[in-house]
Amino acid sequence: MKNEKKKSGIEPKVFFPPLIIVGILCWLTVRDLDAANVVINAVFSYVTNVWGWAFEWYMVVMLFGWFWLVFGPYAKKRLGDEKPEFSTASWIFMMFASCTSAAVLFWGSIEIYYYISTPPFGLEPNSTGAKEIGLAYSLFHWGPLPWATYSFLSVAFAYFFFVRKMDVIRPSSTLVPLVGEKHAKGLFGTIVDNFYLVALIFAMGTSLGLATPLVTECMQWLFGIPHTLQLDAIIITCWIILNAICVACGLQKGVRIASDVRSYLSFLMLGWVFIVSGASFIMNYFTDSVGMLLMHLPRMLFYTDAIGKGGFPQGWTVFYWAWWVIYAIQMSIFLARISRGRTVRELCFGMVMGLTASTWILWTVLGSNTLLLMDKNILNIPQLIEQHGVARAIIETWAALPLSTATMWGFFILCFIATVTLINACSYTLAMSTCREVRDGEEPPLLVRIGWSVLVGIIGIVLLALGGLKPIQTAIIAGGCPLFFINIMVTLSFIKDAKVHWKDK
């Protein structure tokens, strides 16, 4: 009994270091917000200007890796001996569900405004050219390229899970073929896991920092409750308590149902926006934007603006590539888990086609709606952002639709459920990664899950206190740096082991 307790308890070497590091950083930030903002700007400038090119090359190389998997010697290899666990339709639906987070609703609604007001390639702000390239850049940042990189890592994790039968809950577990068991389970593996966990904690905190203002702004619109930092903190606290109650009372089934409701409601809300906003314009704009994407793709892939120094690729492309890098392991583990029994080619094609369709639908519908509202002078987005903040501007793009009260209730419920499931997933992932061993079918310890949800909530509040998008972008970029190297190591480890294991079969 004692031994079982020890097994399911925390793993000190990967529990306490991230906790201490993140705690100290939060304390230093809160202690002097102005100084923290100076540091944040310096870190953002250094990473994006000095190392931005590395993130761009990483994505390009991983794209070539995707083609190698699809058309190479492993294309027909099956990831596990069993038949696929889910039907193709259910599998794609689960992929779509993984895309409908509140952070995605945040960027999908407002991103196009930033691209049009500060466009790439030296275009005039708010010009016809800027509007033509605006959605094309969203399709680039949230299209086949990043999903191709995820599919490569998903194949790697599915290989370790279902072919090599490894119990992978931390990235160090996958590095045995590359660095040897001694190093993977020793100091080197511990350092890798700690970097992964610190980056993941900040990534989850930033997602919460994006999602919370949407909910509190909805509350202000619906109930007249003023949006303040204190209200943000209260809402985050309520979510943490709700998550703790769900876990303590064994209501995980309820959380899964909530996740399904989120997916169906996402379809409903997107369909509503598509119909009432202007379906013909949306389809025409999408078609035009795909053409613009294909025409400018080579330049977009390698665009650093080294001569013009306008800052667009650093502020957006490098930021988003870091965003994809930082979430790669967590998302790839999930996508690998639901892909048991599929071939390498099936997984790669299914992910790129299914997930690209999901993100393209979201960005096209929401971005087109925002552009229409600006062009028709229904909303003054710059003024809303300056006077009330980005979250209010996003809320107003939804409130401007017909049946505004019903629409706002739908959006409020969608954001609320999305954030509840986000916190639940955060606490679960971090608890699993910081425990010694959690057997299949078991849940990680309650207190560990609650503890991590509290810490993620604190980070969200700290980022909100700093104000603006720059702290959130910097947290992602800084966290993406170590994950950049870890993702490469996982990829190389898979290639090295597959050459031996799959060659013999």
UniProtKB/Swiss-Prot annotation:
Entry keywords, A to Z: Antiport, Cell inner membrane, Cell membrane, Membrane, Transmembrane, Transmembrane helix, Transport
BP-aspect Gene Ontology terms: 4-(trimethylammonio)butanoate transport; carnitine metabolic process
Keyword Transport listed: yes
Domain of life assignment: Bacteria
UniProt-listed Pfam families: BCCT
Pathway in which the depicted protein is active: Amine and polyamine metabolism; carnitine metabolism
Record-linked NCBIfam families: bcct, PRK03356.1
Entry function: Catalyzes the exchange of L-carnitine for gamma-butyrobetaine.
Subunit comment: Homotrimer.
Protein name in the entry: L-carnitine/gamma-butyrobetaine antiporter
Organism annotation: Salmonella choleraesuis (strain SC-B67)
Primary gene name: caiT
